[in-house]
Swiss-Prot record:
UniProt keywords, alphabetically: Aminoacyl-tRNA synthetase, ATP-binding, Cytoplasm, Ligase, Magnesium, Metal-binding, Nucleotide-binding, Protein biosynthesis
Gene: pheS
Quaternary structure (record): Tetramer of two alpha and two beta subunits.
Name this polypeptide is given: Phenylalanine--tRNA ligase alpha subunit
Cofactor-binding details, from the entry: Binds 2 magnesium ions per tetramer.
PANTHER family (alphabetical): PHENYLALANINE--TRNA LIGASE, MITOCHONDRIAL (PTHR11538:SF41), PHENYLALANYL-TRNA SYNTHETASE (PTHR11538)
Family: Belongs to the class-II aminoacyl-tRNA synthetase family. Phe-tRNA synthetase alpha subunit type 1 subfamily.
Species this chain originates from: Mannheimia succiniciproducens (strain KCTC 0769BP / MBEL55E)
Length: 329
């Protein structure tokens, strides 16, 4: 068994040299001594050459030596694995005192903020929100609003036409006609929505937003219209504004007025248009103008937003520049 003693001593010496070699070196050692052609495996195979009466004792000695080396090998493997795990944990250690990643919260677009602010005010006065198609017929966009074909007011709308009868709506007023066709007075509605005109510069875009108001009942008068708009403008801008009503012309209202507010620079600024619903408009939807009257008002949402937040270029609302939009959170 001199060979067993030499192999055991060689194995112990080899393991001592592996104290800092790592798991790969341990695996190579295992294969060399305990693999299919390993030293201890060959010793076990050599038992067939030992006399039968001596074989159990010799086998026991081989197993004892083999197990002693395996115990050292397994202990070193466990120590190496623990050291590797500790090194990995140290490398991946998280400092729980560090601040977490900031969660960026979005905010409403300034145009959406204005629509929300306007509709909230008028909903408290009993107005309900109505909507309608953005692809509109010539009848609802013009004819029913007292703007017949060849009327000069049509030229001011810079219309996007699909064909002679179909267009992208230039105003949300068509929804008023659709509502009056379905309902009888009293009617109290507001119509926020997108409208389209073929114009693009610092104060105009091809698509923008309007909010229209319509109130119809018996004995509705211009004084009520003025009172509602006075209260709205002062609530919207949160200031005790100077407001004036300037005579104007709209085909679908009579009398008509433009509403101005006094700016901080001492100049009047136009903010919306309004008037009493024209009798011809009422007749077109089957409402008797001798029994009912009403007022209508229309405002550009981007215009109101620019004035409220001191924005000078309308196009800023459509460029999706986060540096601009973050100011309105």
């Amino acid at each position: 068994m001199q060979n067993l003693k030499e192999i055991t001593e060689q194995a112990r010496a080899a393991l001592d040299e592996l104290h800092d070699k790592g798991l790969d070196a341990l695996e190579a050692f295992r294969v060399e001594y305990f693999g299919k052609k390993g030293h201890f495996t060959q010793l076990m195979q050599s038992l067939r050459n030992v006399a039968a009466e001596e074989r159990p004792a010799v086998g026991a000695k081989i197993n004892e030596a083999k197990q002693a080396v395996l115990d050292i090998l397994n202990a070193k493997k466990e120590a190496f694995e623990k050291a590797a795990l500790n090194a990995q944990l140290e490398k991946e250690r998280i400092d729980v005192s560090l601040p977490g990643r900031k969660v960026e919260l979005g905010g409403l677009h300034p145009v959406s903020l204005t629509i929300e602010r306007v509709t909230k005010f008028f909903s408290e006065l009993g107005f309900s929100v109505e909507s309608g198609p953005e692809i509109e017929s010539d009848y609802y966009n013009f004819d029913a609003l007292n703007i017949p074909k060849h009327h000069p007011a049509r030229a001011d709308h810079d219309t996007f036409w699909f064909n002679p009868e179909l267009l992208l709506r230039t105003q949300t007023s068509g929804v008023q006609i659709r509502t009056m066709e379905k309902k009888q007075p009293p009617i109290r509605i507001m119509v926020p929505g997108k409208v389209y005109r073929n114009d693009y510069d610092q104060t105009h875009t091809p698509m923008f937003h309007q909010i229209e108001l319509l109130y119809e009942d018996k004995k509705v008068n211009f004084t009520e219209l003025k009172g509602v708009l006075y209260d709205f403008l002062r609530a919207f801008f949160e200031e005790d504004l100077q407001v004036r009503f300037r005579p104007s012309y709209f085909p679908f209202t009579e009398p008509s007025a433009e509403v101005d507010i006094m700016g901080k620079n001492g100049k009047w600024l136009e903010v919306l248009g309004c008037g009493m619903v024209h009798p011809n408009v009422l007749r077109s939807v089957g409402i008797d103008p001798n029994e009912y009257s009403g007022f209508a008002a229309g405002m550009g949402v981007e215009r109101l937003t620019m004035l409220r937040y001191n924005v000078t270029d309308l196009r800023s609302f459509f460029e999706n520049d986060l540096r601009f939009l973050k100011q309105f959170k």
